[in-house]
Amino acid sequence: MQCNINDIIKILPHSYPFLLVDRVIECDPGMSIKAIKNVTFNEQFFIGHFPGHPIMPGVLIIESLAQASAICVLGKKTVENKVVYFMSIENAKFRKPVTPGDTLILQSNFEGLRLGVYKFKCVASVGKEEVAGATILAKLQDK
């Protein structure tokens, strides 16, 4: 499954400036996803993080991974009155700064489901270099 921004807007409840996935390259719904976030100098967070030395905040890289994971849970179908809530982060690591002009590759792989909580192993890369990673827990719930 592939998705463009118009599909993503229908799947996720997020909107500008907090929609942090631009395209889905491949997705096996419920199992894995590979998506892209194009990082541009026009991002609002670069105004203050950091003036003269723009770096994408690590928490937003993790949020990008969580949004990609939510798309993986939902697939391309619209789930009425449901939303995927980000519940926790485990073992977050930040290895290299992400700067304007980078294409952030978001990879999320399903690791398990327990008591309705999805567990994903996530990695963010620029090119072939890993820039961040974490285990993300999320739950599909009523809105």
Curated annotation (Swiss-Prot):
Any one GO BP annotation for this protein: lipid A biosynthetic process
Catalytic activity: a (3R)-hydroxyacyl-[ACP] = a (2E)-enoyl-[ACP] + H2O
One Pfam family it belongs to: FabA
GO molecular function term, any single one: (3R)-hydroxyacyl-[acyl-carrier-protein] dehydratase activity
Alphabetized UniProt keyword annotations: Cytoplasm, Lipid A biosynthesis, Lipid biosynthesis, Lipid metabolism, Lyase
Active-site residue list: H49
Enzyme Commission number(s): 4.2.1.59
Residue stretches spanning the membrane: none
GO cellular component, as recorded: cytoplasm; membrane
Principal location class: cytoplasm
Protein localization: Cytoplasm
The keyword Electron transport appears for this protein: no
Similarity field: Belongs to the thioester dehydratase family. FabZ subfamily.
HAMAP family in the record: FabZ
Task performed by this protein: Involved in unsaturated fatty acids biosynthesis. Catalyzes the dehydration of short chain beta-hydroxyacyl-ACPs and long chain saturated and unsaturated beta-hydroxyacyl-ACPs.
The protein's name: 3-hydroxyacyl-[acyl-carrier-protein] dehydratase FabZ
Gene for this chain: fabZ
